[in-house]
A protein has these predicted regions:
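Conserved phosphotransfer microenvironments
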Residues: 1-36, 40-51, 58, 70, ...
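Non-catalytic signal-transmission and effector/linker regions of two-component phosphorelay proteins
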Residues: 1-3, 53-60, 64-150
Length: 152
């Protein structure tokens, strides 16, 4: 990562989940600004093992259900998190999703972003010129994910 900078790290744990979390800790220690996302196959055993891990170096955990739209949702969610100041500074609307079930938010976020992007595209067609169309597309509501009420 020193030779070539990365904007995002997505890891899928193999048999030993602790290796993924140890690797995340090493990466976060040296590159704290780089988001680290874990994609896991959904199973009760994996969920139990993840609960025992130190999650401080992981930005998000998602359950891989085979939906390719999840990758777009992850990127959009991280973009929204980075542009969080637009909500208070510029007045961009926000949708706060408060959910602690990894499996549920992994399945709902792709649908939510697909709906928002479709609505933004429809809304942008009402603009008078291309510049206004781009502003309307980028002005879609931001989505924030909180995994508990305190985080929200």
């Amino acid at each position: 990562m020193r030779a070539k900078p990365f904007d995002l790290v997505i890891a899928m744990p193999g048999g030993d989940i602790s290796e993924t979390f140890d690797g995340a800790a090493l990466i976060k220690a040296e590159f704290p600004a780089v988001p680290f996302v874990v994609l896991t196959p959904f199973s009760k055993e994996v969920s139990r093992r993840i609960e025992k891990q130190d999650m401080s170096c992981i930005d998000y955990v998602f359950s891989w259900l085979g939906n390719m739209d999840l990758l777009l949702a992850i990127i959009k969610l991280l973009e929204d998190k980075l542009n969080e100041n637009d909500i208070s500074d510029v007045g961009i609307r926000m949708i706060m999703l408060v959910e602690d079930s990894v499996r549920f938010y992994s399945s709902i976020l792709p649908h939510l972003y697909k709906f928002l992007l479709k609505q933004s595209r429809l809304f942008s067609t009402e603009a008078l010129n291309q510049h206004e169309q781009m502003l309307r597309m980028r002005g879609r509501p931001k989505v924030m994910l909180a995994r508990n009420y305190e985080e929200a």
